[in-house]
Amino acid sequence: MKSFKLLSRKFKALGNERRLRIIEELLKYKRLSVGEISDKINLSFRSTSRHLKILDNANFIDCEHVGINMYYFISSEAPKEFLDLIKKFN
């Protein structure tokens, strides 16, 4: 049952165009701050943060603090098949 919940979370995370664009940008640039992501996908800082939290909860991305900034990158736990599928539609 637990694995179905995680799978459901992953599909929900990918079921939004803006979150797919965030993943696409992180695949392209490797590591970005919330502000950089927000500028690249033309979305408010607050909305971008909300989408990043959903992607983080689904284990697609990780983050690290550097000074006062938070940088996001693709998680090593992100399923390769999902990432390959996203790259295909670039």
Set out the residue ranges of the language-model regions.
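Pre-recognition alpha-helix immediately N-terminal to the DNA-recognition helix
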Residues: 20-24
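Key DNA-contact positions within bacterial/archaeal DNA-binding proteins
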Residues: 46
